[in-house]
Amino acid sequence: MKKNTVLLIVALFVIIAPWLFRPAFATINAQIQKETTYVDLNGDWHVVGEVLNTGNVWLTQIRISATLRAQNGSTIDFPAAYTFLNNLSPGEAAGFNVMEDNAANSGAVSSYTLNLEFHESQPVTFALNAYAVNATKDIYGSIVLTGFVQNNGNTESDYTKVVGTFYGADGNVVYVGMTSTDPATIPLANRQPFQLTVPGADRSNLVTSWSLLVESQQFTSIPEWQTPAIIAGITLCLAVVTLRVATVGRTLPLPSAASRLVRRVNVTPSFEPT
């Protein structure tokens, strides 16, 4: 009974944490960073990068529009895209990929400018973790990431997606990709697998590190700053309960390594061909 009470307290902390630190005065701001351009094997032009939430409120509907120009200064096209995450917490960065899918236009691009639009949104519950991530390269030179997403929320997680932002040696973004867990719905206190691929050696060979973020209709990834607080809260609650039940000879274990999950996986990969 007491153990269930502790677990309930921890779950409530996770749910209300986004609201505990809401600022008194809202600052709505964001910036584009770490962008690079490339032309893929199909002849399509891309600009990939991140949008960093530099304000103190959540953002949504984050749209990046590009103005493409030829060498003579004439305008070619106005492609646009949204970040792969629908909701962005303060201090977080979300990847984007703006693509020009007309080969003739792509070949004529000499310069570009980017415009950023966004709106304030309400906080989203932190409840999802990507973990046990394994990286391999297939026979085509593609990077293949496999792992699991854990649902630590208070209800099922629908339309669960994993967003990968991949960086080169200079720290700039070289690829952004997205996949869904299989299946996309994760029941309460359960996990589902995912697989995310960086296709082809032309992009994969540039990758030196990456980050993974998870989002669903109900939840988003547990951020790094919150994880230590959760662990501290769990440890404190367990210590109190352990003291109270010590007279009857019962103790409660500390959280396992599996429970100490973090939002972001950001490593230098070491690949083994499959």
Language-model segments: residues:
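Hydrophobic beta-strand segments
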Residues: 63-66, 81, 161-164, 179
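Secretory targeting signatures
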Residues: 1-28, 220-274
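Short, solvent-exposed loop/turn segments enriched in Ser/Thr/Gly
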Residues: 42-48, 141-146
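Terminal connector regions
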Residues: 85, 100-142, 176, 199-222
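Intrinsically disordered, low-complexity Pro/Gly/Ser/Thr-rich segments with frequent PxxP/GP/PP motifs
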Residues: 76-105, 174-203
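Short acidic/proline- and small/hydrophobic-mixed sequence motifs that coincide with surface turns
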Residues: 58-61, 76, 109, 156-159, ...
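Asparagine-centered strand-capping/turn motif at beta-strand->loop junctions
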Residues: 51-56, 149-154
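Short aromatic-acidic-glycine turn motif
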Residues: 68-78, 165-177
